[in-house]
Amino acid sequence: MDGSVAKGTSCIQDSQSSSVIANTDATLGRHLARRLVEIGIQDVFSVPGDFNLTLLDHLIAEPRLKNIGCCNELNAGYAADGYARARGVGACVVTFTVGGLSVLNAIAGAYSENLPVICIVGGPNTNDYGTNRILHHTIGLPDFSQELRCFQTVTCYQAVVNNLDDAHEQIDRAISTALKESKPVYISISCNLPAIPHPTFSRDPIPFSLSPRLSNKRGLEAAVDAAVTFLSKAVKPVMIGGPKLRVAKACDAFVELADSSGYAMAVMLQPKGLVAEQHPHFIGTYWGAVGTSYCAEIVESADAYLFAGPIFNDYSSVGYSLLIKKEKSIIVQPDRVVIGNGPAFGCVLMKDFLSELAKKIKKNETAYENYRRIFVPEGTPLKSEPNEPLRVNVLFQHIQKMLSDETAVIAETGDSWFNCQKLKLPEGCGYVTNNSLSAWYPFYLQTLEEKSSCCRYEFQMQYGSIGWSVGATLGYAQSVPKKRVISCIGDGSFQVTAQDVSTMIRCEQKNIIFLINNGGYTIEVEIHDGPYNVIKNWNYTGLVDAIHNGEGNCWTMKVRTEEELTEAIATATGEKKDCLCFIEVIVHKDDTSKELLEWGSRVCSANGRPPNPQ
């Protein structure tokens, strides 16, 4: 046997090589730890509580697994989200109900973004199930299922482990389901079980075997033939990548089609960074009236458009204002293709469809040539006068210069969406597809290291939970320690989750955080203004200095002018390059991107539609 593995089969090692585990290590807690390590998790984000303390003891006993204690459960969940974006899977550990319901919001966000996050909860003692006892950390009822029922709508699998006999099976099924579905799962483990040995944990676990999903061959052929016929009739077809390129692992196939077709290629906002922006036919971000200049004009004037993995919600469609006609569209979802108003082809995987279409499509560069004819390069911000108050567009001009293959960008919900979408990601950018979870794990970390040498861009648009970026920055940076994470966070969002800057310092992270202080919830102001959008101003650098408290490496600076910003960036990337750098950028409360002004008015109109007549 040559040791080769069929393409797409997940396997960690030959199961015949499994060794006997000492009885003291053959516990439920240690088994769970080994399983997490096996799929690529090296860090778990946790908040201790009396129901999960023994479990945490056994997780940290695994030398390959590090516990990252967070300030609250919400941030622990956001950190697992950020970790999963870089590594392909993440995990958090919280306590029963008070911890579970606190982390629930973050798990819902991970579900919306198709991220496999394993949410582990320390549950009640096995002897309390089925009794009439009332426990603390509950709502005062003897029914312990409230937490489980809450998680059922935001996870793809739920396991309640209160019996050792089936614990092995339940844990394995939950983890494998998270990887197969690319969604979060919930695992509750009774607090009196983690330390108990059991025969099912006495050997190294048999490796996960995730059989590859296959396209229906006849359906694939029919879908490709129908698409070729549809596109061959078009004079100026275009192609647009959507956020589900990530979960479909179809980024390479999408670029392959762009190479062979010659079509003008754009991406929607959510998948920015999933494909290289240096591609010769890349025309920018398609986001209707607020996307890259001239991109919407080319896309919406096309007579055929292929969307790969789109999500058309009210935010991505700018208040449902995109000028897209269904009869001109090919919509390719992870396992389904719909051409115009029909036909539809199920059981056809996106990556297979795009790859096969690339082999048969005729080259047509008309749309891209049209783009080249009308394109006018964007101007640069007005030059600042000496000591003039800093403008946001000047800030992002400087952030642009900081980007390299050694950086990643995290954009908070708000005006940072609009400013960061205008950043030009440097050569080598592209999503690190976690195909290694479909291959041999021993090569996983090597593959991750090789492919992570690119500038990445992450944000949460579908769920849009303000404060997400603090925890996500913590998790992302922990997963890829060789990168310097640049986070752009508004003051309102920062006030929601600020505490875990403390955890970044404790973990010796070297992130650069730009705190944009404009005195309120700017994105809400542009949708619907009111006194509730004004927040209490904090001394943000003073707060971070207090959190730092002289322990660890942290440097802060408050900037009000371009000269001060230039000095701060030079220090952060030079003398303080090994520190967590927190730069508070003070700008005018009305200083927003023009795109936010347009987007806000359209979303406001969509939100304000009167009820349909009954």
Swiss-Prot record:
<comment type="similarity">
    <text>Belongs to the TPP enzyme family.</text>
</comment>
<dbReference type="Pfam" id="PF02776">
    <property type="entry name" value="TPP_enzyme_N"/>
</dbReference>
<dbReference type="Pfam" id="PF02775">
    <property type="entry name" value="TPP_enzyme_C"/>
</dbReference>
<comment type="subunit">
    <text>Homotetramer.</text>
</comment>
<feature type="binding site">
    <location>
        <position position="524"/>
    </location>
    <ligand>
        <name>substrate</name>
    </ligand>
</feature>
<feature type="binding site">
    <location>
        <position position="50"/>
    </location>
    <ligand>
        <name>substrate</name>
    </ligand>
</feature>
<dbReference type="GO" id="GO:0000949">
    <property type="term" value="P:aromatic amino acid family catabolic process to alcohol via Ehrlich pathway"/>
</dbReference>
<feature type="binding site">
    <location>
        <position position="520"/>
    </location>
    <ligand>
        <name>Mg(2+)</name>
    </ligand>
</feature>
<feature type="region of interest" description="Thiamine pyrophosphate binding">
    <location>
        <begin position="415"/>
        <end position="523"/>
    </location>
</feature>
<keyword id="KW-0210">Decarboxylase</keyword>
<keyword id="KW-0460">Magnesium</keyword>
<dbReference type="InterPro" id="IPR012001">
    <property type="entry name" value="Thiamin_PyroP_enz_TPP-bd_dom"/>
</dbReference>
<keyword id="KW-0786">Thiamine pyrophosphate</keyword>
<dbReference type="InterPro" id="IPR011766">
    <property type="entry name" value="TPP_enzyme_TPP-bd"/>
</dbReference>
<dbReference type="InterPro" id="IPR029061">
    <property type="entry name" value="THDP-binding"/>
</dbReference>
<feature type="binding site">
    <location>
        <position position="491"/>
    </location>
    <ligand>
        <name>Mg(2+)</name>
    </ligand>
</feature>
<dbReference type="InterPro" id="IPR012000">
    <property type="entry name" value="Thiamin_PyroP_enz_cen_dom"/>
</dbReference>
<feature type="binding site">
    <location>
        <position position="518"/>
    </location>
    <ligand>
        <name>Mg(2+)</name>
    </ligand>
</feature>
<dbReference type="InterPro" id="IPR047213">
    <property type="entry name" value="TPP_PYR_PDC_IPDC-like"/>
</dbReference>
<dbReference type="InterPro" id="IPR012110">
    <property type="entry name" value="PDC/IPDC-like"/>
</dbReference>
<dbReference type="GO" id="GO:0000287">
    <property type="term" value="F:magnesium ion binding"/>
</dbReference>
<feature type="binding site">
    <location>
        <position position="137"/>
    </location>
    <ligand>
        <name>substrate</name>
    </ligand>
</feature>
<keyword id="KW-0479">Metal-binding</keyword>
<dbReference type="GO" id="GO:0004737">
    <property type="term" value="F:pyruvate decarboxylase activity"/>
</dbReference>
<dbReference type="InterPro" id="IPR047214">
    <property type="entry name" value="TPP_PDC_IPDC"/>
</dbReference>
<protein>
    <recommendedName>
        <fullName>Pyruvate decarboxylase 2</fullName>
        <ecNumber>4.1.1.1</ecNumber>
    </recommendedName>
</protein>
<dbReference type="GO" id="GO:0005829">
    <property type="term" value="C:cytosol"/>
</dbReference>
<keyword id="KW-0456">Lyase</keyword>
<dbReference type="GO" id="GO:0030976">
    <property type="term" value="F:thiamine pyrophosphate binding"/>
</dbReference>
<dbReference type="Pfam" id="PF00205">
    <property type="entry name" value="TPP_enzyme_M"/>
</dbReference>
<dbReference type="InterPro" id="IPR029035">
    <property type="entry name" value="DHS-like_NAD/FAD-binding_dom"/>
</dbReference>
